[in-house]
From Swiss-Prot:
<dbReference type="InterPro" id="IPR017453">
    <property type="entry name" value="GCV_H_sub"/>
</dbReference>
<dbReference type="InterPro" id="IPR003016">
    <property type="entry name" value="2-oxoA_DH_lipoyl-BS"/>
</dbReference>
<protein>
    <recommendedName>
        <fullName>Glycine cleavage system H protein</fullName>
    </recommendedName>
</protein>
<feature type="modified residue" description="N6-lipoyllysine">
    <location>
        <position position="65"/>
    </location>
</feature>
<dbReference type="InterPro" id="IPR000089">
    <property type="entry name" value="Biotin_lipoyl"/>
</dbReference>
<dbReference type="GO" id="GO:0005960">
    <property type="term" value="C:glycine cleavage complex"/>
</dbReference>
<comment type="function">
    <text>The glycine cleavage system catalyzes the degradation of glycine. The H protein shuttles the methylamine group of glycine from the P protein to the T protein.</text>
</comment>
<dbReference type="Pfam" id="PF01597">
    <property type="entry name" value="GCV_H"/>
</dbReference>
<comment type="subunit">
    <text>The glycine cleavage system is composed of four proteins: P, T, L and H.</text>
</comment>
<dbReference type="GO" id="GO:0005829">
    <property type="term" value="C:cytosol"/>
</dbReference>
<feature type="domain" description="Lipoyl-binding">
    <location>
        <begin position="24"/>
        <end position="106"/>
    </location>
</feature>
<comment type="similarity">
    <text>Belongs to the GcvH family.</text>
</comment>
<dbReference type="InterPro" id="IPR002930">
    <property type="entry name" value="GCV_H"/>
</dbReference>
<dbReference type="GO" id="GO:0019464">
    <property type="term" value="P:glycine decarboxylation via glycine cleavage system"/>
</dbReference>
<dbReference type="InterPro" id="IPR033753">
    <property type="entry name" value="GCV_H/Fam206"/>
</dbReference>
<dbReference type="InterPro" id="IPR011053">
    <property type="entry name" value="Single_hybrid_motif"/>
</dbReference>
<keyword id="KW-0450">Lipoyl</keyword>
Length: 130
C-alpha cells in the first residue's frame, strides 16, 4: 500500500498539500502517483511570482512511462519552486513528500484546502481504484 500521510490534504488526481508554519502551502505528488508513473525524468514547475488556481494545471511531471499534469490544491502566488528537481527529478520517486515537493504557494484563501481529500478519504479512493 502507498504511503499516505495523515497531516496532508489530497486531490483525486494524486497531488498532496501541506500547510507550512509560515502559512504557505507546499504541493507535490503522492507516493501512489510516483509509483504509477515509474522513473521520473523531468519536472516542469510554475515560475516564482506566477499565479496558480485551485484545480487548474500548474506543472507537468514526465516519466519513462507517461507525462502527467500537476494541479494546485489552492489558488495563490507561487513563492518557491523546488530547484533540486531540475537536476535530480528522480527525487520525486525517492522522497515524494519531503525532498521531492514541487512548489509553494502563498494562498489567497487557505480554506480552499477544506475541499481536498483527507488521508482517510484518499486511502478509500485508492482502494476503490484497485
Amino acid at each position: 500500500m502507498s504511503d499516505i500521510r495523515k497531516e496532508l490534504k489530497y486531490l483525486s488526481s494524486h497531488e498532496w498539500a501541506r500547510v507550512e508554519e509560515d502559512g504557505t502551502v507546499t504541493i507535490g505528488i503522492t507516493d501512489h502517483a510516483q509509483d504509477a508513473l515509474g522513473d521520473v525524468v523531468y519536472v516542469e514547475t510554475p515560475e516564482v511570482g506566477s499565479r496558480v488556481s485551485l484545480g487548474e494545471e500548474a506543472g507537468v511531471v514526465e516519466s519513462v512511462k507517461a507525462a502527467s499534469d500537476i494541479y494546485s490544491l489552492v489558488s495563490g502566488k507561487v513563492v518557491a519552486v523546488n530547484e533540486l528537481l531540475q537536476d535530480a527529478p528522480e527525487t520525486v520517486n525517492s522522497s515524494p513528500y519531503d525532498e521531492g515537493w514541487f512548489f509553494r504557494v502563498q494562498p489567497d484563501d487557505v480554506s480552499e484546502l477544506d475541499e481536498a481529500l483527507s488521508a482517510d478519504e484518499y486511502r478509500e479512493l485508492l482502494e476503490s481504484e484497485e
